[in-house]
């Protein structure tokens, strides 16, 4: 029986730079296309925490205006989707399969008064030592939290 399958990829599984990400999504495309070849309909979702942080850091230059987080999120969705779409399309073509692949950039509506903003629970960006995280928090006002034993972000 053919099914609609949702595949979720974590942002941390997508690599730390564009070259690494292209290789990882190329590898990921193989089992995804296996499912498409079996007749299943796939929806892919992905994380982007590290990528949003890397984009934000790229604008950390006094000569360049800062990039707001919503735009960083859209940029990360765009380039991650671009890499996924290309890798899946290439794998489909290699197998002689003509199947459409599309990328959708999403938006989220939030209430700025939501008390959850006072205690963020989803860290993004690069990992830092506790000392460096405290320094960044003091300089920027960002909330820095320990993340899964991997450091602070």
Residue ranges, per PLM feature:
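N-terminal glycine-/serine-/threonine-rich phosphate-binding loop
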Residues: 1-50, 54-60, 72
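Ligand-binding beta-strand-loop-alpha-helix segment within the catalytic cores
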Residues: 62-153
């Amino acid at each position: 029986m053919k099914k609609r399958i949702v595949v979720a990829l974590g942002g941390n599984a997508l690599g730390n730079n564009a070259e690494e990400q292209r290789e990882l999504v190329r590898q990921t495309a193989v089992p995804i296309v296996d499912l498409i070849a079996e007749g299943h309909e796939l929806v892919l979702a992905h994380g982007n925490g590290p990528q949003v942080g890397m984009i934000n850091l790229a604008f950390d230059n006094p000569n360049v205006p800062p990039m707001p987080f919503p735009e960083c999120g859209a940029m990360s969705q765009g380039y991650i989707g671009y890499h996924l779409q290309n890798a899946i399309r290439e794998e489909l073509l290699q197998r002689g399969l003509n199947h459409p692949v599309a990328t959708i950039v999403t938006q989220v509506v939030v209430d700025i008064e939501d008390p959850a903003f006072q205690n963020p629970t989803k860290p993004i960006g690069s990992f830092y030592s506790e000392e460096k995280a405290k320094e960044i928090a003091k300089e920027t006002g960002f909330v820095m939290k320990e993340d899964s034993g991997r450091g602070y972000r």
